[in-house]
């Protein structure tokens, strides 16, 4: 399987790394295009794959084309590809760009729209995806193999859920990192060395996520398991709730969702 990845940024690189790790394609069968010579040099050295600045050269002979560029650059890219596709599977990972927006400009319908996230860099990604209705079972299987190589994948028959997933899992790592940063700073504030605070926070986050995944309990129930009457945790939770953490998170996710929708409307 020959794969062209158009865009060698963080997510484009994560896809290439995942494909190689899962041995879905050999190094000689992957081409990455990127406008920045510095990125091409890095990717060529790091993964021993072919690189080019020419999108059309990259897609020549490809079985799968991954569109991993910024949403604002899509009009130019789709214009370059229009009329040049015959049987390739196209996978777009651009936020907010709808299937109809891609298919209509390409006049081509073997298209998957996906929203991975940055933990894909370490094989722990969460990718939401949908596809054009007439996509064959074979192409669907290829899409699943590539997306699952990055971690977990979730298919949605209704495309409206992709913008919602963008606001949760696509942008979500940034929310988590902000929370982690704040907890580390809090640890330093009360006297912990930063490296110790960092370890405590990271392991707490990882352990909490793992216990929720394995025990399959509602987060409120798990929270109550930590909270003793009159204890330290209840005082901390009172401050978080009084400060509006819950409503801030809801409003933040809603803002990201609205932004994702607006990108598709442009």
PLM feature spans:
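NAD(P)+-binding Rossmann beta1-loop-alpha1 motif at the extreme N-terminus of oxidoreductases
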Residues: 1-46, 50-53, 60, 105, ...
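Small-residue helix-packing motif on alpha-helices
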Residues: 30, 58, 193-200, 222, ...
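Internal alpha-helical scaffold of NAD(P)-dependent oxidoreductase catalytic cores
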Residues: 105-110, 126-164, 177-214
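Short pre-catalytic strand/loop immediately N-terminal to key active-site residues, enriched for Gly-Thr
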Residues: 111, 162-167, 219-224
């Amino acid at each position: 399987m020959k794969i062209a990845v158009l865009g060698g940024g963080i997510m484009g690189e994560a896809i290439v790394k995942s494909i190689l790790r899962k041995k879905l394609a050999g190094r000689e069968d992957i081409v990455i295009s990127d406008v920045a010579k510095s990125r091409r040099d890095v990717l060529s050295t790091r993964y021993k794959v072919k690189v080019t600045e020419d999108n059309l050269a990259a897609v020549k002979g490809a079985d799968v084309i991954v569109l991993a560029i910024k949403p604002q650059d899509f009009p130019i890219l789709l214009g370059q590809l229009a009329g040049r596709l015959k049987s390739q599977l196209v996978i777009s990972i651009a936020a907010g760009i709808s299937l109809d927006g891609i298919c209509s400009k390409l006049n081509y319908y073997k298209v998957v729209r996906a929203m991975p996230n940055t933990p894909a860099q370490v094989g722990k990604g969460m990718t939401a995806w949908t596809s054009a209705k007439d996509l064959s079972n074979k192409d669907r299987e290829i899409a699943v193999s590539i997306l699952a190589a990055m971690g977990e994948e979730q298919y949605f028959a209704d495309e409206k859920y992709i913008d919602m997933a963008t606001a949760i899992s696509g942008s979500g790592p940034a929310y988590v990192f902000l929370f982690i940063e704040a907890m580390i700073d809090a640890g330093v504030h009360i006297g912990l060395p930063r490296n110790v605070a960092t370890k405590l926070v990271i392991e707490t986050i990882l352990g909490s996520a793992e216990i929720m995944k394995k025990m399959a309990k509602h987060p409120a129930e798990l929270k109550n398991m930590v909270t003793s009457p009159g204890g330290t945790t209840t005082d901390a939770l009172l401050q978080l709730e009084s400060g509006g953490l819950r409503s801030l998170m809801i409003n933040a996710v809603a803002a990201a969702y609205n932004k994702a929708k607006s990108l598709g409307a442009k």
